[in-house]
Amino acid sequence: MQVNVDLKENSYKVFIDEFKELTIKGNVAIITNPKVGGLWLEFLLKNLKCDKKFIISVPDGEEYKNLNTIEQILEQLFSSKCDRKTTLIALGGGVISDMTGFAASIFERGIDFINFPTTLLAQVDASVGGKTGVNNKFGKNLIGSFHQPKAVFCESEFLNTLPPREFSAGVAEAIKMAVMFDKKFFEFFENSTLKSSDEIAKMVQTCVKIKADVVVKDEKETGIRAVLNYGHTFAHVIERITDYKEFLHGEAVSIGINMANNLALRLGFLSKNEVFKISETLKKFNLPTTFKIPNADEFYELFFMDKKTQNSKIKFILANSIGEFKICTDIPKDVVIATLKDFE
């Protein structure tokens, strides 16, 4: 299956279970980590035709998604005499995709890159849409750029080697899209165990279609694309205060979704039954839904480091009902604090 991301001169296709062989003019640098490289690098190299192939291996983990690692990638590209005709390939999950895209956007003012997402989270979300970047001490993804890939190859085979915890983390991002945009898709998660390859393929296809549609409408996140950050305003603070070590990104998003839903309940948007249904669906896929906040006031202040915060107004993405979103920039501080205190 193919999904077209129609962005005029930046258009590209997402290929789902269609990869056989890839021919690229010029040199190729594959960016991966030791774990993924050990599993899938040989498979990619065997089916890749180009001039020269370079392998750049970076440490595995969100804590390495920073400018230091980008500097290492750039140094290896320069020392290998790569140029503007070089194509980067991201072979890995969301961290690899984000860093490869960012490196491609700034190396000699921009070169091509292709995504081979090997995690469910990357296939349903991170690899599509051109958001690239790294974290710093002030927060997550605060340094980055919009740089669209030339193609994305989502192979179900990659998911066969994914640890169960990583798989569940990807499901959280998929449920996020269902709650925001598609009630029937949410019912799919209520009724599915995601044990069959057909169900998994259906989930990936639906998510890619939703993501592509949103990106086409709002490539640079000036409007509706911000809705894809549902759960993330809370999740990014959780990741930061736990130093990116306690939760996988999708797990933090799952907790963030539940926190956002409790805020929506307090504001009268969601019913108790809807909050319960979403929470139980997340739990069904072994995802966490709660986190003990050390201090509600300090947690609240960290919202201001979120990229969506503008003019000192925190932008909250909430569910108005399952399948319908609401963007709020004027929620009183005391209402948010009261919600956070429920998690203290």
UniProtKB/Swiss-Prot annotation:
TM stretches of this protein: none
A GO CC term assigned to this protein in UniProt: cytoplasm
Keywords, alphabetical: Amino-acid biosynthesis, Aromatic amino acid biosynthesis, Cobalt, Cytoplasm, Lyase, Metal-binding, NAD, Nucleotide-binding, Zinc
A Pfam family matched in the record: DHQ_synthase
Binding residues annotated for Zn(2+), in chain numbering: 173, 232, 249
Keyword Lyase included in the entry's annotation: yes
Residues that hold NAD(+) according to the record: 60-65, 94-98, 118-119, 131, 140, 158-161
Cofactor comment: Binds 1 divalent metal cation per subunit. Can use either Co(2+) or Zn(2+).
Cysteine pairings via disulfide bonds: none
EC number: 4.2.3.4
SUPFAM superfamilies: Dehydroquinate synthase-like
Pathway given in the UniProt record: Metabolic intermediate biosynthesis; chorismate biosynthesis; chorismate from D-erythrose 4-phosphate and phosphoenolpyruvate: step 2/7
Organism superkingdom: Bacteria
CDD domains reported in the protein's UniProt record: DHQS (cd08195)
Location(s), subcellular: Cytoplasm
Leading EC class: lyase
An annotated GO BP: amino acid biosynthetic process
One MF term in the entry's GO annotations: nucleotide binding
Function: Catalyzes the conversion of 3-deoxy-D-arabino-heptulosonate 7-phosphate (DAHP) to dehydroquinate (DHQ).
Protein family per UniProt: Belongs to the sugar phosphate cyclases superfamily. Dehydroquinate synthase family.
Designated name of the protein: 3-dehydroquinate synthase
